[in-house]
Amino acid sequence: MNVKMLHHVCIQTEKYEESLKFYTEILEFELVKTAVNFHKRDFNTWLRLGTFMIELQTAKKGDKLKDWSSLNEGIVHMCFLVDSVQVEFEKIEKLGYTNFKIKNGEKIYKVEDGYLFKIKAPEGTEIEIRDMLI
């Protein structure tokens, strides 16, 4: 397969307004396009950060989404590489977002040759922010 890039990840949510605010205001994604009443969904929205996109959508009318769990098969979290974990952590904290994952009593923790922290989006998606490639 000759892949050019990872195009997008689709995230479904029953907390659309909260999730949209999280991705645009906390993680600084750009809102590209919103479709209303898209294939039986109230909203289907495209968000972009650099070349990476998220398709944020509500459930189809009449469907009830199950809560996120790290025990599900498939993707467990997504990760963004940054220059400084500390700078990004402080920026998110100053914006008032507090849903950080705690490990060994710490919000930021050392792994291998760098640092990382994890936050939970309103719909449950776990997002890792790290400052080293592997």
PLM feature spans:
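Helix-adjacent hinge/juxtasegments
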Residues: 56-57, 65-78
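Short, conserved charged micro-motifs
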Residues: 18, 85-90
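Vicinal oxygen chelate
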Residues: 2, 89-134
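Core segments of cupin and vicinal oxygen chelate
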Residues: 12-53, 110
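A short, acidic/glycine-rich surface segment
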Residues: 32-34, 40, 61-67, 102, ...
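Short, charged/polar surface micro-motifs in flexible loops or helix N-caps
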Residues: 50-54, 61-63, 83-86
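Short beta-strand micro-motifs in enzyme catalytic cores
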Residues: 41-45, 76, 113-117
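N-terminal beta-strand motif that seeds the catalytic metal site of vicinal oxygen chelate
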Residues: 1-18, 75-80, 131-134
